[in-house]
């Protein structure tokens, strides 16, 4: 029997719910607290701690339809996607799980019942495999379920492999829960090439694995040892795409309903008539992984999960380009995907606008260089004497044009070439080494200046210090002395001036000598030195002079308050929006603060209000802002967050505000959170795909912002009230005018029935009040007659009937309007000379009005 993919999903979940299982929502594609996984790649990932006995849940049986991604890391299907019938970057894994509840016998019985009774698969099309030494599973299949012994295949360890290295001994990764498994295969028929599992021809497509039942008995440690789990458990997985293909009578996963709708939509968008084109399959697969990854918080980037996402997007865009796509196209498939995925796309539907925007921007950015990069790649392939493209060219395409190596490999493979992967990796490592070497130096505020001096910062506890001048620079050149009016950089041996770092702007102030005054406008890092940028206002200043360095204490205090508020803001955002929020940049000034962070969509007014509430609550608690020096590992164990883009030494400063915020920070802060006074967000907006920016003020500036906002609201409210009154007056005048004009036009439609004037008309855009006015106007113009008017507004029918007094003995308006109303799903009534009604079936209005003439004729 045919079942849609959505029906298969629902049938599976309902079946196991009837067997006492708790239906658990799919977890995020980003594994929670599991650094061993790049992406969620199996249904059991979210239950890992349950299998280990480290987590107790309110249920011991669970069932899920888990979204999974396999692209990057150990489980990487990217290169095969689109070129085989069953490889995908994204798939759904149906699963049922037992946490120390039932074990092999029930698991096998459940699987067999669902397949043969719920889905009604022919038993003679199914065969099973068990681990070679798992006699218990063999006996259950054979003696209790009744599967013939010749349809049960024992699978041992791979030749030359390690113990337990078998298709029928499952591991999640190098570590974690594992155990023997039994797999169920479906026989697609003799007309398809392929052999039974365990034979040399097993890689054929005749016998397809549809369900894997893993019997979790061990926890595998990094050294390879197997520790028995506290209680044996069960983890099963069945790819929804494979079982849907069987239920829909097709062989390839790409022929099922979900993929066919995506393939057809893609073909229509890019203008491709050949629905069997492999590029259409690639795009249909990739829109699934990309959309759901973005919806789960992954953003395109050049590292980690973000880079895998970027690779998939760019691979899809390249295949669209190959099909002749004009302009951006990929993001247009998100809406189709949200529709075809049914109940699995609830969260995607909420995030649809954000997902579309991220994909569109990424495609636009890559599209600018794709065409040129393809020209260079094809020229390089044309010039090859052999069959391998060198690693340097592959690296150039990556470095200059953003071509991931696997995309280059795709193009090369299509032309029967390979790429030098080792050479590419060598070039990549050389680039990483150059970056490491460059990263050893501080920011060059002026690239021409090279300074060997080293400054010591002593400003955490002081804003004034005596110090010696160790270097002077004017226009990038070192000099021995400064004269009044010189714009220069002064390097001191010790300084209380904070150099810009971690988003906190540099200090300003003055350097005083007995004979001169240097105005410090900004402070920056210069190698290992601290550079005071400014102008010599009076006198002279020479290398070796002793100065009194005085920081602008009032400005410093304002900056420190805003910096502490930034930490509170960061923590509050993570509480309100989620732990996916990560700092992407900040700027802390005396006037205000700016904070950039990762988030997929605009922060709502309610969320901003809650963030403000949390921050101000911490301010009122007046936490002591504690600073502790510790090694980086201890800081991480304490849960300290590291700031975006910052490089830390082995010893770090850990800043804590109660138990609300703990961050690594080398900046200047207030003594207590209460010093901040008040916190007010002044703006929130997007600055890039998936990156939001909040600007805020504190203290007196926050009070001023609140007052200004209140005044602005009052002005807007008054303006709105005035405009509303004016518009209401204009609208009524227009309605009266339109009614009068319409009445004049309708007179031409008057006809006679048995010597009586009759007007029946349908008017669009007029409300009931206007219709009543028309009826009165028409009565006056006709002198004697019967009027029936109808209109449709907001898909609802409005009806008005009018009869002059001389005719009410024969025709009553209430009866007339009720006759028409009954035909449009309504009812009504009124006086003999005027009546009104309503209805719900707007499509029936024309035929209902057409029946009026005959009805009137019968009564005259």
From Swiss-Prot:
Domain statement: Consists of three domains; the N-terminal catalytic domain, the editing domain and the C-terminal C-Ala domain. The editing domain removes incorrectly charged amino acids, while the C-Ala domain, along with tRNA(Ala), serves as a bridge to cooperatively bring together the editing and aminoacylation centers thus stimulating deacylation of misacylated tRNAs.
Against Gene3D superfamilies, the record matches this protein to: 2.40.30.130, 3.10.310.40, 3.30.54.20, Bira Bifunctional Protein, Domain 2, Threonyl-trna Synthetase, Chain A, domain 2
Main location, first listed in the record: cytoplasm
| SUPFAM superfamilies for this protein | Class II aaRS and biotin synthetases (SSF55681), Putative anticodon-binding domain of alanyl-tRNA synthetase (AlaRS) (SSF101353), ThrRS/AlaRS common domain (SSF55186), Translation proteins (SSF50447)
Localization: Cytoplasm
Where do the record's region annotations for Disordered lie? 824-843
The cofactors named for this UniProt entry are:
Zn(2+)
Positions binding Zn(2+) in this chain are: 563, 567, 665, 669
Report the SMART domains cross-referenced here. Answer: tRNA_SAD (SM00863)
Q: What Enzyme Commission number(s) does the record list for this chain?
A: 6.1.1.7
Q: Which reaction does it catalyse?
A: tRNA(Ala) + L-alanine + ATP = L-alanyl-tRNA(Ala) + AMP + diphosphate
Q: Is Zinc given among the entry's keywords?
A: yes
Q: Name one GO molecular function term.
A: aminoacyl-tRNA deacylase activity
The UniProt gene name for this protein comes to alaS
- The scientific name of the source species is Vibrio vulnificus (strain YJ016)
Please name the PANTHER family in this protein's record.
ALANINE--TRNA LIGASE, CYTOPLASMIC (PTHR11777:SF9), ALANYL-TRNA SYNTHETASE (PTHR11777)
Q: Which NCBIfam families match?
A: alaS
Q: Which UniProt keywords apply?
A: Aminoacyl-tRNA synthetase, ATP-binding, Cytoplasm, Ligase, Metal-binding, Nucleotide-binding, Protein biosynthesis, RNA-binding, tRNA-binding, Zinc
**GO CC terms on record?**
cytosol
User: Per the database entry, which stretches of residues form a coiled coil?
Assistant: none
Q: What is this protein called?
A: Alanine--tRNA ligase
Which Pfam families does this one have?
DHHA1, tRNA-synt_2c, tRNA_SAD
What domain of life does the native source organism fall in? Bacteria
Q: Give the record's cofactor note, including how many are bound.
A: Binds 1 zinc ion per subunit.
């Amino acid at each position: 029997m045919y079942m849609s993919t959505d029906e298969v999903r629902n049938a599976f979940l309902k079946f196991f719910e009837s067997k006492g299982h708790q239906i658990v929502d799919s977890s995020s594609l980003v594994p929670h607290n599991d650094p061993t996984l790049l992406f969620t790649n199996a249904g059991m990932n979210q239950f890992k701690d349950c299998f280990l006995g480290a987590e107790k849940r309110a249920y011991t049986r669970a069932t899920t339809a888990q979204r999974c991604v396999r692209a990057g890391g150990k489980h990487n299907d990217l290169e095969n996607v689109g070129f085989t019938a069953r490889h995908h970057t994204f798939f759904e894994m149906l699963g049922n799980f037992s946490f120390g509840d039932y074990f092999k016998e029930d698991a096998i019985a459940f699987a067999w019942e669902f397949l043969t009774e719920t889905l009604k698969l022919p038993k003679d099309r199914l065969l099973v495999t068990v681990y070679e030494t798992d006699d218990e599973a063999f006996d259950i299949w054979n003696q209790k379920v009744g599967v013939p012994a010749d349809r049960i295949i024992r699978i041992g360890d791979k030749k030359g492999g390690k113990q337990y290295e078998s298709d029928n001994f499952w591991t999640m990764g190098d570590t974690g829960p594992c155990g023997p498994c039994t797999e169920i295969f479906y026989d697609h028929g003799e007309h398809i090439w392929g052999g039974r599992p365990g034979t040399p021809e097993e890689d054929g497509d005749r016998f397809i694995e549809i369900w894997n039942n893993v019997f979790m008995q061990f926890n595998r440690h990094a050294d390879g040892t197997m520790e028995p789990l506290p209680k044996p458990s069960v983890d099963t997985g069945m790819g929804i795409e494979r079982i849907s293909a069987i239920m829909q009578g097709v062989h390839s996963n790409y022929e099922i309903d979900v993929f066919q709708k995506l393939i057809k939509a893609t073909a229509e968008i890019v203008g491709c008539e050949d629905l069997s084109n492999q590029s259409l399959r690639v795009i249909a697969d990739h829109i699934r992984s990309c959309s759901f990854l973005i919806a789960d918080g992954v953003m395109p980037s050049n590292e980690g999960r973000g880079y895998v996402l970027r690779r998939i997007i760019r691979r899809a865009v390249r295949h669209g380009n190959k099909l002749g796509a004009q302009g951006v196209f990929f993001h247009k498939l998100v809406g189709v995907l949200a529709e075809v995925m049914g109940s699995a796309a609830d969260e995607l539907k909420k995030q649809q606008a954000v997902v579309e925007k991220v994909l569109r921007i990424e495609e636009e950015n890559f599209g600018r260089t794709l065409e040129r990069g393809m020209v260079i790649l094809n020229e390089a392939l044309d010039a090859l004497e052999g069959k391998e493209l060198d690693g340097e060219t592959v690296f150039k395409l990556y470095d200059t044009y953003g071509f991931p190596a696997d995309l280059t490999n795709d193009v090369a493979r299509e032309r029967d070439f390979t790429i030098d992967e080792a050479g590419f990796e060598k070039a990549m490592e050389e680039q990483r080494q150059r970056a490491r070497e460059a990263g050893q130096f501080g920011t060059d505020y002026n690239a021409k200046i090279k300074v060997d001096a080293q400054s010591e910062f002593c400003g955490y506890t002081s804003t004034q210090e005596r110090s010696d001048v160790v270097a002077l620079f004017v226009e990038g050149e070192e000099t021995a002395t400064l004269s009044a009016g010189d714009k220069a950089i002064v390097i001191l041996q010790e300084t209380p001036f904070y150099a810009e770092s971690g988003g906190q702007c540099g200090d300003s102030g003055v350097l005083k000598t007995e004979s001169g005054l240097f105005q410090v406008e900004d402070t920056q890092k210069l190698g290992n030195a601290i550079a005071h940028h400014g102008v010599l206002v009076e006198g002279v200043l020479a290398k070796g002079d002793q100065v009194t360095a005085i920081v602008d204490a009032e400005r410093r205090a304002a900056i420190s308050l805003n910096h502490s508020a930034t930490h509170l803001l960061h923590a509050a955002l993570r509480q309100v929006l989620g732990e996916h929020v990560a700092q992407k940049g900040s700027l802390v000034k005396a006037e205000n603060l700016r904070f950039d962070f990762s988030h997929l969509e605009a922060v709502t007014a309610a969320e901003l209000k809650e963030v403000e509430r949390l921050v101000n609550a911490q301010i009122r608690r007046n936490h002591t802002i504690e600073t502790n020096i510790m090694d980086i590992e201890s800081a991480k164990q304490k849960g300290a967050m590291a700031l975006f883009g910052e490089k830390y030494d082995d010893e770090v400063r850990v800043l804590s505000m109660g138990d609300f915020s703990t961050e690594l920070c080398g900046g200047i802060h207030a003594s207590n959170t209460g010093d901040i006074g008040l916190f007010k967000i002044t703006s929130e907006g997007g600055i890039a795909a998936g990156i939001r920016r909040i600007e805020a003020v504190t203290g007196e500036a926050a009070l001023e912002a609140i007052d200004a906002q209140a005044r602005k609201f009052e002005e807007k409210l008054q303006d709105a009230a005035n405009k509303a009154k004016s518009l209401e007056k204009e609208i009524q005048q227009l309605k009266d005018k339109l009614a009068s004009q319409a009445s004049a036009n309708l007179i031409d439609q008057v006809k006679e029935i048995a010597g009586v004037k009759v007007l029946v008309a349908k008017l669009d855009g007029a409300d009931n009040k206007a219709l009543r006015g028309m009826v009165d106007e028409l009565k006056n113009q006709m002198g004697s007659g019967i009027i029936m008017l109808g209109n449709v507004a907001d898909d609802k029918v409005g009806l008005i009937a009018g009869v002059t007094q001389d005719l009410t003995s024969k025709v009553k308006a209430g009866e007339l309007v009720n006759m028409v109303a009954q035909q449009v799903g309504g009812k009504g009534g009124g006086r003999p000379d005027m009546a009104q009604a309503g209805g719900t079936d707007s499509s029936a209005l024309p035929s209902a009005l057409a029946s009026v003439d005959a009805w009137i004729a019968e009564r005259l």
